[in-house]
């Protein structure tokens, strides 16, 4: 790297500063590129996380709905049993009256 001392002092930069900058500029560029890639992947991950969260919420809603239906089905089964008992009593009563 050819750095003219007069040009460096005219620009206000010390030759050592220019050397350090030239050595680090490649690394800084790669760091900047890595940060941009991380931001992009973070955005993709956030979108995917939102999709997964919505999917889990939908599944939880289905499970809750199914559980509430189970309670209603159990209630209907109990009512059916009670109706069967009442029908048997009624048949006994009708049978005893007709005899």
Swiss-Prot record:
Disulfide bonds: none annotated. The keyword Ubl conjugation does not apply. It comes from the Eukaryota. Residues 34-94 form a coiled coil. It is found in: Endosome. GO terms for cellular component: endosome. The keyword Isomerase does not apply. Keywords: Coiled coil, Endosome, Transport. Belongs to the SNAPIN family. Component of the biogenesis of lysosome-related organelles complex-1 (BLOC-1), a complex involved in endosomal cargo sorting. Component of the biogenesis of lysosome-related organelles complex-1 (BLOC-1). This is Biogenesis of lysosome-related organelles complex 1 subunit SNN1. It comes from Kluyveromyces lactis (strain ATCC 8585 / CBS 2359 / DSM 70799 / NBRC 1267 / NRRL Y-1140 / WM37). The lineage of its organism: Eukaryota, Fungi, Dikarya, Ascomycota, Saccharomycotina. The gene is SNN1.
């Amino acid at each position: 790297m050819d750095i003219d001392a007069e040009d460096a002092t005219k620009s206000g930069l010390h030759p050592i500063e220019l050397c350090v900058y030239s050595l680090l500029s490649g690394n800084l560029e790669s760091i900047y590129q890595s940060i941009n890639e991380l931001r992009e992947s973070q955005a993709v991950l956030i979108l995917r996380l939102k999709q997964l969260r919505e999917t889990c919420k939908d599944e939880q809603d289905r499970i809750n709905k199914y559980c509430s239906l189970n309670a209603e089905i159990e209630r209907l089964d109990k009512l059916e049993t009670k109706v069967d008992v009442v029908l048997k009593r009624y048949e006994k009563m009708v049978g005893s009256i007709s005899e």
